[in-house]
Structures are given as C-alpha cells and as structure tokens.
Amino acid sequence: MILISDATLRDGNHAIRHQLSAAQIHAYARAADEAGIDVVEVGHGNGLGGSSCLLGQTPISDRLMLETARAALRTSRLGVHFIPGLGKAADISLALEIGVDVVRVATHCTEANVSARFIEQTRAAGRTAFGVLMMSHMAPPDALLAQAKLMERYGAQAVVLMDSAGYSTPSLVRAKVERLVDGLDIDVGFHAHNNLGLAVANSLVALEAGARIVDACVKGFGAGAGNTQLETLVAAMEREGHDTRTTFERVMTLARGTETFLNPKTPHIQPANIASGLYGLFSGYVPHIQKAAQEFGVNEFELYKRLAERKLVAGQEDIIIEEASRLARERDVQRATGGVRVRELSA
C-alpha cells in the first residue's frame, strides 16, 4: 500500500506567508483524517523552529499548531518537517511531547550527515523518522544513494527525495528513485513541485520506480507553482491500480470542503475536470453534469461513473438527464426498501 503524506498544512503555509490560523489547521486536519490521509504534516513552511523575521513569522506558535492538529486527528498520523540549523533538538522534543508521530528530518541533498542526532533522537522516543534530501536535482543518483545510506544508517525508516525546485523531468526521477530503491533496505518517497507542470507525472514515475511514499497538497497548495495536487494524484493512482487508504471521491470531498475555510489560490485543476478526465468524459459535459446532479439531487461523482459506463461521446447531452433521472429513481427505491440497492434487487 502506498503511503500519502499530505503537506497542505506545512508546504501550503509558504503560499500564504506562513499565516495559517489555528481554526484552519483544525478544520483541515479533521477533514484530512476523515478522508483517510495517512500522514498530515503541520507547521511553518520551513518546519519546526522556522518562524522568524528572515523566513516569515507565523501568527501562532509551533506548540499551538501541533496541539491543534493533534486534537483533530483520529486515524491519520501527525507529521512535522525539521531542518537542522533552523530547528533545534528542543523543537523535536516539544513535537514528541505533543504527540507527533512522524518526524521528517530534511537536509540539503549533499549534507545528510547533519541529520544523525535528530533521526536518532526521534527513534529513541519510539517515533517514526524519515530522512528527506532537499533540492535533489542538484546531485546525481549515486551521490543521492550515498547520502540516503547515511540516513538509513542513522535509523531513518524511509528516505524522501524532494524536488524542491520543480526542476526534475520523469527520466531524472526514474533514474534517482530506482537507484535508491535498489540500494536501500528502507522505503523511498518522492515530493514534487509543479514548476514544469510535471508534479503528478513525476510522482507516478516515482511509484513505478518503486517508491512507497508520495507527498501531495490539496489543490496543489504549496510554495511557488505549488506541489503535487492531491486530488489529481489520487485519481491518476487509481487509474494505475495503486492501493491507498483513501479514494478519489474522498479527496474530492476534502478538496471541495476547503473552499469554506482555506480556498488555496495556487494553480490547480478543478475537481469536476479531474473527474471528467478520470472517467473519460468530454470536458464540455462538466457544467451539464453538475446541473443535472443538482436538479435531481444525486451524487455528482456517481453520475460521472454511470455516464462513463454509457461511453458517451460529444452531442449526447440528453443521456446526462436520463442517467441523473435513473439515479434519482434508484435512490428513492433504496430509501423505500430500507437501504437495499436497486442493482442488488435486479441481480
């Protein structure tokens, strides 16, 4: 099973000058938990101890951010980003005290040696430690493997390659991830940025190459051109048969819910357009499908699925109404029969 680490409440902070509020953190963490996200990463964009005049000051402390998220999470694990030098051992101690589950110790891709004491500190407390190699485009595969091996030796349970500049192309990602997968005895992860419009493609290639962890943010909410868009990634992963704890429909619900309390402004693809792509429907049908779903009071995404089964082509708008009406009738019969689905009755 692929682990999804959601950096919306950490990398997303970069996009708004680190101004996430406690209310936003609580609302998103609760929604991500309900959506089945594995790890919810929280904090200043630069991680624990990052709030400063130089890097940008947060309106609330690391303690309050983490306590707020901890209180909202039930099944998702709470994660933090930590850069040695910006953060101190005391910052990790605070995070562990509050109940952080995953500490991601991040260094420049050629400076893994500075991660040792912090990985060891995390493991000694019985928590999960990931190593993160930032700006990974700046080192060739063999050099990255050597650095990752150091993190593995220190006790890291996974190493994540971070394409911090959004520089990488699929061929570069494949070569580097394959090298780490072949050379390590721990899991490999990948964190993409979308500067070249390749974040989802690069993440899929990383998975094909053997990565078991992918990072993403709702609506691509993150630094610069944004991160891998969570909704698009999950849709593409479903198409490719990757197993996760969440589903496309659950992350769609998560993304739409953020419009009331987060509403990221980073460039992203709308949920309805992702659905039309996932199910192979003509893009021009989207407003018609949304209107029909609203008029008949049916689930929009179930309607996409039904229309995909009909293999619609352009010019068949009438079938949208037909299928929406059928879904509404099935719903009414289901209610009348105490929850038995119409398709089950006719099977």
Curated annotation (Swiss-Prot):
The keyword Manganese applies. One of its GO terms (biological process) is catabolic process. InterPro entries: 2-IPM_HCS-like (IPR050073), 4OH_2_O-val_aldolase (IPR017629), Aldolase_TIM (IPR013785), DmpG_comm (IPR012425), DRE_TIM_HOA (IPR035685), PYR_CT (IPR000891). The keyword Transcription regulation does not apply. Mn(2+) binds at residues 11, 191, 193. Gene3D superfamilies: 1.10.8.60, Aldolase class I. Residues 2-252 form the Pyruvate carboxyltransferase domain. Substrate binds at residues 10-11, 164, 191. It comes from the Bacteria. The record marks 10 as: Transition state stabilizer. The active site is at residue 14. It is an enzyme of class 4 (lyase). GO terms for molecular function: 2-isopropylmalate synthase activity; 4-hydroxy-2-oxovalerate aldolase activity; manganese ion binding. It comes from Burkholderia pseudomallei (strain K96243). Its EC number is 4.1.3.39. Keywords: Aromatic hydrocarbons catabolism, Lyase, Manganese, Metal-binding. It holds the Pfam family HMGL-like. It catalyses: (S)-4-hydroxy-2-oxopentanoate = acetaldehyde + pyruvate. This is 4-hydroxy-2-oxovalerate aldolase. Signal peptide: none annotated. SUPFAM superfamilies: Aldolase, post-HMGL domain-like. Belongs to the 4-hydroxy-2-oxovalerate aldolase family.
